[in-house]
Structure formats: C-alpha cells, structure tokens
C-alpha cells in the first residue's frame, strides 16, 4: 500500500469504545452493531459475542476488553472502517476501561432509560474525558415499560454536562436506533491523527498467551507503519523481535501484511516470556526507533491481597504457571511466593477488588484444574515502628508485635453511592457501621441521591457491596477511588488452637470491634473443627491478651460401662486413669483444621 492510500484509509477509520454501568446493555449493543455491519451472519450470532470467556457469559458481565474491526457503508456512500473496543463496566475493572480508551478517539456512552445515570457511568465518563474522547450519549432500553427518555436526557445534561439533545434513543435488544448510532460515530468521532511515514509508535493495550505463537500483543498504531518481517523493539525493555504475523479481528482473525496509523490489531513475534510484553508499552522499529515512548497509562496498583495455596503441595509449580499465564492478559494481577506454617507453600496475590479476586480464583480452578485454599483478603497497611521504620504490610501474619508499633495507617477510599432516596437512611447506617465519615449528599433529581462517604478500604473489601445491595433491594450503585492513608487504631488478632497460633487465620481489625469479631470467629471455628479425643481450646488474642475463647469438648469413651454396681472408689480410679491419658494426649496431639474453617473466617458475616 502506498502512502496516499494509507492516508485515504486513515481518514475512513473510526476508533470507538462503548462505556456504561453494569447491566445497561453494553454487550447487547455490541452484538447489534456486529450484526448491522454484517461482521457475523445471523447463524454465527450468539448473545454476548465479544465476551469470549464462559465465566463472562455465566455471570453476564464483561471482564476482558475485546477489539473488532467492522466495515460500514454510511448514508453518504463512503465505506468506513470502525474499530469497536468493548470494555467492562464493573468498578474492579476500571483499568481495563482506561486501557481500551487509550486506544480510541471516541466513546459511546450507554445509559439505561429506566435506571438513569449510575455511579459507574460517571466514573467511566471522567476516564473518557481524561483521554480527550468525543463522547456520544445514547439512551438504551427504550422498549421497557418504565423507560423515561426525557428524564434521562435531562439527567445526562445536568449530572454529566454533556449535550444530550442528539442522544439516540435505542433498544439494543429490539435493534432500534442502531443505524443512527453508526451514523453519529462516522460523523462525530474524529479520524485518527498520525503520520504513516513517521517512525513507528504502537501502543500495547492488551496481550494474551497462545500455545503455538507465544505471546500475542493487541496494539493500536499511533504513528508509522508495521509490516510482517519488520524488526521491532519494545521501548521499556529494549528487546528486539521479528514480526511473524499481523491480524485484525473481524471477530474472526484476518491476517494482514501491514498495520498503519489508526489500525487496531494483534501482533505476534515469537515472544516467549510473559515479561517482555508489558501492557502500556510502546513498540517501535529497531532500525528507525521513535524518540520517546507514548504516554502509557498509569500502573494499576492492587488494592486487595490474599494468599493462594494449592491443596496438593505437588501442584505448586502448576499454580505458578497458571498465575503467570493469567498475568499476561491481566496487567493488574501481582503475585509473589510465600510460605505459611499452617498451609505450606503458596503465593501472595494482589487484586484490584473482590470481584477481580473471585474471577481469578475461579479461572485458575476452571482453566487449570487446581484446587486451592485462599486466606482472608487484606489490604496494604503502612506500619510505623517505634524505631521510626515504615513497613508496608500486606499479610496480617507479618505485622510486628504490638509493643514495637508506633502507629498504623490504613488506605481510605472516597465512595460515591447513588440510590433512590427511600434508602438514604439504610445507606448512612451501613456507612456509619463501617467506620465511614459523611462528606456530601446531593439530589440528582427528585427521586435519586448521590451520597459521598470516606471509608476505610478494608471495610469495603469484605462484604460492603453485598450489604449495600441487600439494604437497598439492589437499587444502589457504588463507585470508589483511593484517596490516601489515614491513621487508625488497628490491632492484629491471632487465633490460637490448642495454644498454638495458626498464622493463616490471623487478621487485622479495629480495636473497638476486636471483641465482637473475635467472638464471632471463635464460635464459628468451634462448629467447624471436628472433635478430638482431647479438649481443644480456641482463643482469639490481641497481643498477649485473650479477648474471646471457646472450647471443643473431648470425645470420651464410657470407661464405667463394665462396672456393674461396683464401688465408687473403683469408678473414680478408672475416671482418674482416663483423665491422665487425655492429659498426655493433649500434650502431643495436633489439631486438623478443615478447609471449611479457613473459608468460614473469610465469609466475614457477623450475623
């Protein structure tokens, strides 16, 4: 292709993504667009076409971003090339959204005609504005009986400040308004700017592992042209590779000889190791490198940590391989080896949130068939010791002793909850219970309120989302962002079984809740740990002070069964002898902790 053709083609490219709150109909809209542009025949169509993972289909959520190239002939008779980059909507996957937005010039903002604007809608709009994207609002689900298009139009203007006069009323399910959306994309989303002659600069916005081709990178070409056979260089590591294959997805992979400015496609170059392809890195040509890398996006830092241990210790290396594979396409997953006295060898893993953690665990169990024990999730605490050292503690068992700690700081988030105003009381009560500080409350319209609180991240991590949904019958939506660290009165709680500390059951708790929390867990463990031949005390301790205790009674044989009538001193002798035996047994006996017991401590419900 010569340069004039490249420039002509560049003018016809439109890169856009679809952003929305969970359940506002993003994946359905993507399906309809694929159908309308003839990318798939009706025989090949299935719901959630772009959600390739079984897990995504089952839960009805999008986890991974996906990119497809579509051809569309507009009403002006021109043929346009559209690159649709699908994005997730859940708060844990915000970084997936920011990655896909970095590869676009426009975003279609889907708002549910019945529900209106939700917390996540706002968060995604701000991400799109940060990336200077052209935002096209559309109002979806207009076929619902409870749809109120005019109210939502007004809401978009008042809350987000976008002009909604041209917002297309759509029903992705019924296929209404799809053509108008495509026409708006062609008319309003700018064509990519960039010079096909300049040195190559391509942004890696995703990658995955293929058993035959090694690591495959998804790229968006910003400047220059890349051809099969070119020697390319990764700018962050300086390593060189030869391009073996270029392709675009039309959902089916279609091989290309070259990718030029504005193209979104995949590149494979027999890259063997996962670490060589970093999401957010820039690819350039080895013989004519670009001066500087593209501004990648910020590194996402995990918010929640937990330990993963294989139940069968022999599968430790399999677990490592599974995590490495998942890390390829999931830039935010971090892990490092760790050992626990109770559970043996495993990994400490960092996740963006609880949903992210569940998804990764489920993928390891499904895709790699590894059964695991997980320890209670924990956040990173900053601990200042009396010696003036600052430690970053992500594992409660690494917390220094109480007397060596000067103070502990924990991460706080600013949480925005959007809710119908009937539930304001319930939400405020929940936030107060979770040690929240009230910041602000504003009415979006006559029926809906946005409440802002500052909360410790550790309180959100466990079950805040579930409790929020149940106290508002599922109507409230939540978005949160990290705002920094604040000092708190925190203590480490150890669980002792038969006077021995079980490190995997330790957790960090606020001093005011230590007694209640200890009592709940001790009682729960009492139900779950099987009875032994000897008595087992279960204790919850803060430092050297025991705050709660429960005892698992011993199983005992009836040694008096053979004494008919008989003298009391004879019976007493037998009972004393049994007591001695139990005492000896208690000295040497060890307590087996079943998997359910670890799990029970995780399900931190205090009811």
UniProtKB/Swiss-Prot annotation:
CDD domains: EF4_II, EF4_III, LepA, lepA_C. Signal peptide: none annotated. Keywords: Cell membrane, GTP-binding, Hydrolase, Membrane, Nucleotide-binding, Protein biosynthesis. GTP binds at residues 23-28, 140-143. One of its GO terms (cellular component) is plasma membrane. Pfam families: EFG_C (PF00679), GTP_EFTU (PF00009), GTP_EFTU_D2 (PF03144), LepA_C (PF06421). It is found in: Cell membrane. InterPro entries: EF-4, EFG_III/V, EFG_V-like, EFTu-like_2, G_TR_CS, LepA_C_sf, LepA_CTD, LepA_IV. It is a peripheral membrane protein. Residues 11-193 form the tr-type G domain. Coiled coil: none annotated. Its EC number is 3.6.5.n1. Gene3D superfamilies: 3.30.70.240, Elongation factor 4, C-terminal domain, Elongation Factor G (Translational Gtpase), domain 3, P-loop containing nucleotide triphosphate hydrolases, Translation factors. It catalyses: GTP + H2O = GDP + phosphate + H(+). It is an enzyme of class 3 (hydrolase). One of its GO terms (molecular function) is GTP binding. One of its GO terms (biological process) is positive regulation of translation. HAMAP family: LepA. Required for accurate and efficient protein synthesis under certain stress conditions. May act as a fidelity factor of the translation reaction, by catalyzing a one-codon backward translocation of tRNAs on improperly translocated ribosomes. Back-translocation proceeds from a post-translocation (POST) complex to a pre-translocation (PRE) complex, thus giving elongation factor G a second chance to translocate the tRNAs correctly. Binds to ribosomes in a GTP-dependent manner. Belongs to the TRAFAC class translation factor GTPase superfamily. Classic translation factor GTPase family. LepA subfamily. This is Elongation factor 4. It comes from Exiguobacterium sibiricum (strain DSM 17290 / CCUG 55495 / CIP 109462 / JCM 13490 / 255-15).
């Amino acid at each position: 292709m010569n340069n004039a053709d490249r420039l002509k083609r560049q003018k016809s490219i439109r890169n856009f993504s679809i952003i929305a709150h969970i359940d506002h109909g993003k994946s359905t809209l993507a399906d309809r667009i694929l159908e309308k542009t003839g990318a798939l025949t009706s025989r090949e169509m299935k719901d959630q076409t772009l959600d390739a993972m079984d897990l995504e289909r089952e839960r009805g959520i999008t986890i991974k971003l996906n990119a497809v190239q579509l051809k569309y002939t507009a009403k002006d008779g021109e043929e346009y090339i559209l690159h649709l980059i699908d994005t997730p909507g859940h708060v844990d996957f915000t970084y997936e959204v920011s990655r896909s937005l970095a590869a676009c010039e426009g975003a279609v903002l889907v708002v549910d005609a019945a529900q209106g604007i939700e917390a996540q809608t706002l968060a995604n709009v701000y991400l799109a504005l940060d990336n200077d994207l052209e935002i096209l609002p559309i109002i979806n689900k207009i076929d619902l009986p409870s749809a109120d298009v005019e109210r939502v139009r007004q809401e978009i203007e008042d809350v987000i400040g976008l002009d909604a006069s041209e917002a297309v009323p759509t029903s992705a399910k019924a296929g209404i308004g799809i053509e108008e959306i495509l026409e708006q994309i062609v008319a309003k989303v700018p064509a990519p700017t960039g010079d096909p002659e300049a040195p190559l600069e391509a942004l890696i916005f995703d990658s995955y592992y293929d058993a035959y081709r090694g690591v495959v990178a998804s790229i968006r070409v910003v400047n220059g042209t890349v051809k099969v056979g070119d020697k390319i260089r990764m700018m962050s590591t300086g390593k060189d590779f030869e391009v073996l294959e270029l392709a675009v997805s039309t959902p089916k992979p279609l091989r290309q000889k070259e990718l030029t400015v504005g193209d979104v496609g995949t590149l494979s170059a027999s890259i063997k190791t996962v670490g060589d392809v970093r999401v957010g890195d820039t690819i350039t040509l080895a013989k004519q490198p670009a001066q500087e890398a593209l501004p990648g996006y910020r590194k996402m830092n995990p918010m929640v940590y937990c330990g993963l241990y294989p139940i069968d210790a022999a599968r430790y290396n399999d677990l490592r391989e599974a995590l490495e594979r998942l890390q390829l396409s999931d830039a935010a997953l971090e892990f490092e080896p760790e050992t626990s006295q109770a559970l043996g060898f495993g990994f400490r893993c960092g996740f963006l949130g609880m949903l992210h953690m569940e998804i990764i665990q489920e993928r390891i169990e499904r895709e790699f068939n590894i059964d695991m024990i997980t320890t209670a999730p924990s956040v990173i605490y900053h601990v200042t010791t009396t010696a003036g050292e600052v430690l970053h503690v992500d594992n409660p068992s690494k917390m220094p002793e109480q007397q060596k700690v000067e103070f502990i700081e924990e991460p706080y988030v600013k949480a925005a909850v959007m809710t119908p105003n009937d539930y304001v009381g319930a939400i405020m009560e929940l936030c107060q219970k979770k040690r929240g500080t009230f910041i602000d409350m504003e009415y979006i319209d006559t029926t809906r309120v946005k409440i802002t609180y500052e909360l410790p991240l550790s309180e959100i991590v466990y079950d805040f989302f579930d409790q929020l949904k149940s106290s508002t019958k599922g109507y409230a939506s939540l978005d949160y962002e990290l705002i920094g660290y604040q000092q708190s009165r925190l203590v480490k709680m150890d669980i002792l079984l038969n006077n021995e500390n079980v490190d995997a059951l330790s957790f960090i708790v606020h001093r005011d809740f230590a007694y209640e929390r200890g009592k709940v867990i001790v009682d729960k463990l009492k139900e779950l740990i099987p009875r032994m031949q000897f008595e087992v005390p279960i204790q919850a301790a803060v430092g050297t002070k025991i705050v709660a205790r429960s005892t698992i009674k011993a199983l005992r044989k009836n040694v008096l069964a053979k004494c008919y009538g008989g003298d009391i001193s004879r019976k007493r002798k037998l009972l004393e002898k049994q007591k001695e035996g139990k005492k000896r047994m208690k000295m040497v006996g060890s307590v087996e902790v079943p998997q359910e017991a670890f799990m029970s401590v995780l399900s931190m419900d205090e009811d």
